A protein has these predicted regions:
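Non-catalytic signal-transmission and effector/linker regions of two-component phosphorelay proteins
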Residues: 1-33, 40, 108, 117, ...
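Short beta-strand/turn micro-motifs composed of small residues
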Residues: 30, 73, 101-105
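Two-component/phosphorelay signaling modules centered on CheY-like receiver
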Residues: 32-51
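Acidic, metal-coordinating helix/loop segments flanking the phosphotransfer/catalytic sites
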Residues: 52-70
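Conserved phosphotransfer cores of two-component systems
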Residues: 64-66, 89-96
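Conserved acidic residues
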Residues: 69, 116-117
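Conserved phosphotransfer microenvironments
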Residues: 73-90
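A short, hydrophobic beta-strand element within the central beta-sheet of small alpha/beta folds
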Residues: 95-108, 119
């Protein structure tokens, strides 16, 4: 799914690329409207640009258009799509993008399984602080 884009589309930021990394932007990937609203509210309140994708395919298209500074991925998407998306991402051109996962599960091993910090719904306590820390050097 996260294969290189066709030659007619811009490629993700690489040395010599004209496509810039939008350092204070976030791509939120979730199919849950409540989680989407909460993530949007948190990110916008802290002054971050945010784009949302409701599926792995939509997220891949957005990644090829604009490289975000951070991905927020809902692991509880239908068909475990969030987990699959993060695993695929880690093996693609986008593996260097910072990722944070959100889930309703309280399994402490999820962070290890997805190689990303995991925050728990519904409150997502501490997520806004973590996002602020991730972007602190570039702001």
């Amino acid at each position: 799914m996260l294969s290189p884009p066709p030659p007619t589309e811009p490629r993700p930021a690489q040395s010599g690329s004209v496509m810039a990394v939008v350092s204070a932007s976030i791509l939120a990937v979730t199919d849950d409207p409540e989680v989407k609203d909460l993530l949007l509210e948190m990110a916008l309140a802290d002054g971050f640009g945010v784009r949302c994708a409701a599926s792995e395919a939509e997220a891949a298209k957005l990644l090829h258009r604009e490289r975000p500074g951070l991905l927020l991925v809902d692991l509880d998407m239908a068909g475990r799509a969030g987990m699959k998306f993060l695993r695929t991402l880690r093996q693609s051109l986008f593996r260097d993008i910072a990722c944070v996962a959100v889930t309703a599960s309280n399994d402490p091993m999820l962070s290890v399984a997805v190689d990303a910090p995991v925050f728990y719904k519904p409150g997502l306590d501490g997520l806004d602080t973590a996002i602020g820390r991730l972007f602190a050097p570039s702001r």
